[in-house]
C-alpha cells in the first residue's frame, strides 16, 4: 500500500496521531531494510500500528505491546475498554490480510514487563506511546534500551507541553535527540553512550 492510501485509511482509525506524524511513521518504517524489527509500545485502536505495518518492508516483524487496561475509558467518547479492543482487533485483522508477509505479534502485557520476551540488541526501532508520565516513560526506556541494536532508533509520541515529563526525560536522556518538525515525535539513535 502506498503512502497516500495508507494515510487515507489510517485517518479512518480514531487516534491522536496527526497526518504529519503518520507520514513520518510510514516513511521511517519504509526506510528500514527487509526483515527489520519494530516495537510499538501503546497501540490503543491501532492508528499508528496500521501505518507502520503498511510502511515496513517484506519479512519484517512488528510487535504491538499494550496491557489494554481500562486507563482511557474516562474519556467521554470511550464507552468501554471492550470497545477499544474491538476496534484494535478489526485493524489487526485488516493488517493480517493486507500484509501476509509480515510477522506480527500482539503482546498483552505491561509495556516494561514485555521487554523480557525480546532478546537484547534485536530491535531496529522502539516507538514509545504508552505511559506518558515521566515515571512511566522512564520505566519503559530502562526496560527497552537494551533491546535496541547499536544504531537503532528510539522514538516516541507526545513530546509537547501537555506532557512535560516526556519533554524533561527525553531531553535529559537524549541530549542529541531530534524533534520531527510539525509533529510531537522525538527520535534518538542508540550509540555506545545510550
Regions found by a protein language model. Name each.
Residues 2-19, 23-194:
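S-adenosylmethionine/decaboxylated-SAM
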Amino acid at each position: 500500500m502506498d503512502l497516500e492510501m495508507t494515510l487515507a485509511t489510517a485517518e479512518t482509525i480514531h487516534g491522536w496521531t496527526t497526518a504529519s506524524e503518520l507520514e513520518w511513521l510510514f516513511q521511517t518504517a519504509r526506510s528500514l531494510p527487509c526483515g527489520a524489527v519494530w516495537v510499538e509500545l501503546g497501540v490503543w485502536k491501532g492508528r499508528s500500528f496500521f501505518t507502520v505495518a503498511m510502511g515496513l518492508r517484506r519479512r519484517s516483524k512488528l510487535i504491538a505491546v499494550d496491557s489494554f487496561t481500562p486507563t482511557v475509558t474516562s474519556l467521554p467518547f470511550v464507552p468501554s475498554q471492550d470497545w477499544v479492543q474491538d476496534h484494535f482487533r478489526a485493524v489487526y485483522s485488516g493488517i493480517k490480510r493486507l500484509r501476509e508477509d509480515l510477522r506480527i505479534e500482539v503482546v498483552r502485557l505491561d509495556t516494561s514487563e514485555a521487554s523480557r520476551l525480546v532478546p537484547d540488541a534485536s530491535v531496529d526501532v522502539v516507538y514509545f506511546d504508552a505511559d506518558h508520565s515521566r515515571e512511566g516513560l522512564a520505566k519503559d526506556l530502562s526496560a527497552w534500551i537494551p533491546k535496541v541494536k547499536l544504531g537503532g532508533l528510539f522514538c516516541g509520541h507526545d513530546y509537547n507541553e501537555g506532557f512535560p515529563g516526556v519533554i524533561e526525560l527525553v531531553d535529559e536522556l537524549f541530549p542529541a535527540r531530534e524533534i520531527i518538525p510539525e509533529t510531537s515525535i522525538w527520535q534518538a539513535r542508540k550509540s555506545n553512550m545510550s
